[in-house]
Amino acid sequence: MSIQTALDEYNLALKQGQREYRELVMEGRSPYPAVLDDILPENNTDSVVDVGLVEIPSERIIGTKSAGRITAFTASFCPLLDSKSEFATKWVNLCAAHLGDTGITDPILCYEYLGNFYVQEGNKRVSVLRHFGSPRIPGTVKRIVPPLTDEPRIQAYYEFMDFYKASHLYCVQFRHPGDYARLLAHLGKKSDEIWEESERRTFNAYFHYFRDAFSALQVPPEEVLPEEALLLWLDLYPFQDLGQLSTAELKKSVAALREDMVANTKKQEAVKVQTKAEDTSKASLLERFISASPDHLNVAFVHQMNPGSSTWVLGHEEGKEHLKKVFGDRVTLRSYFDAASPELAEPIIEQAVADGAQVVFITAPPLSRATLKAAVEHPKVRFLNCSVDQAYSSIRTYYGRIYEAKFITGAIAGAMAQNNRIGYIASYPIFGVPASINAFALGAQMTNPRAQIELRWSCVKGTPQADLLADGIRVVSNRDAPTQAKMYLDFCNYGTYLMNDRGDLIPLGTPIWVWGKFYEFVIRSIFAGGWKRDKGESTALNYWLGMDSGVIGVRLSEKLPEGVHQFAEILKKGLEDGVLDPFRRRITAQDGTVKSDGTRGFAPEELLHMDWLCDNIVGSIPTFDQILPISQQMVRELGIYRDKIPAEKEGKPREDFDRIR
């Protein structure tokens, strides 16, 4: 290869570098490579580990070890010095070698820090190879390991180091703990399972195929990284599809998830919790015309079980019947049952859409990803999933502030517990449940300062109700009534009840779910043109309505003493009017920390993510290993510690790879 050809390549690279320099300066960014010595903290005590010879992903080489000669390159290692300089001569000679028979054979020397590489020796080799689009550059690498801290990025990096031991892959660099486990679960691999060379090649090829499709969306990396986008995509589609989809098909599926990817990466920043029912009664005719509000709606309900086997489904079906009474011929209502898993739910949801559904309520939290998949494939249909804290902008989620009703039944329990001991049977350690336990405990403490709440869980081994009663506890709070029907309170398997001296169970009161009120609110809002989603909107909307909206209620027993009944009614009125806050008081946790000094309440996000218990509660939140297998899926989906739960395997190890080799 002639020197003149190499010189022509240098001049081309120089023009690219000059253009990049101008663009970066115009954007107010540094036009030069990053300098590792400037990034590392002063008095740096990070350890250094020899990694050895690595095929470094070219795009991960972002800087130099020291500041010397950085002005010779742009941030992407394009040259900046004149073509007659000594620097240019060396660059041209390297270029000629690369284009000739010998090639560039010597590996570069560099440092790796938090997944990025900084060149100590071989800057011009990087410049030449990147100019010709080399996807990987061989280098001898030393890794700088930062001290382990609570910072999510550092925790994720420590997970990366374990991931690298098995995979020898640098192409994915997650920023959030738990993401490597999620990726391995999608691939059907164990965390310590060594990757074969064919597996590395396959993953590299598929990841870069996905990255190219994602890059076309031009999402800023500070919002979403390609590997973060891949995780959400893999929640909906199997890994092997990356080897089967055309470029156009892949780009379409990725583009449909754009805003969900942004919302899912931002997590809590992207979740908007709406605690009030919108008043749509005052929408003007002009507003309704502009919003193109419909005159008729086809509404579908998709349930994980059926009314004969699930009181939860029965409650939602009663909510559907409420819609029929309120809207009459303006709505067409259909129900679909036994969507027992996400896989079984997908064709059922598709059938609902094929039947003309314009609004689909999916009443089971474990079906949230099936809901999302349907939503991105049918963007004109409105999808809602009965769950909380889901960071997806394509769907809306809904649940009730049941803790408000628990506060009232707690006050009743405190007044009725003659021995000051009260049993509480909780369902799952999921978002909002600790708030309900604490609200109940605070209510009991209000009427009985000596009250102690003995906590049990129905999602672990044992017989909590029998155990509590056998232990001498006479007042017990159990699961909430699924509907307003009085029979659930009388059963004494729901709500709060008392065992008298004869061993009879006497009902006291129960929280109730009034799903019809929520469904009426949503449908009325759509009729009034209140359902809006702007293009490019990456906010996830979670409805979390309470007693002031009528979605949550309390049924009181006629057997309550008159004074207790009257006091419960006062509390109920205060919560319905929005003037009473169960948590606006001094609160101390089990470990002695003061969670509130009484001058403020808690924000909805704080209540949903509450992971501590009040100091008058005896008991603890179970670990994931203690939870019964039948209950684990719910906890994976909505658990207060879901980000720390080991990833669930999706098939046998290597199954996905074996299928596509």
Model-identified regions with their sequence ranges:
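Hydrophobic alpha-helical segments within soluble ligand-binding/sensing domains
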Residues: 398-420, 512-532
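Extracytoplasmic "Venus flytrap"
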Residues: 298-318, 323, 336-342, 432-434
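Segments of small-molecule ligand-sensing domains
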Residues: 529-660
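A short, basic-hydrophobic beta/loop patch
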Residues: 103-118, 123-156
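Periplasmic-binding protein-like
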Residues: 356-365, 384-386, 472-482, 505-513
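Short, charged/polar connector segments at secondary-structure boundaries
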Residues: 1-120, 130-131, 176-188, 215-280
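Flexible loop/hinge segments that line or gate small-molecule binding clefts
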Residues: 376-399
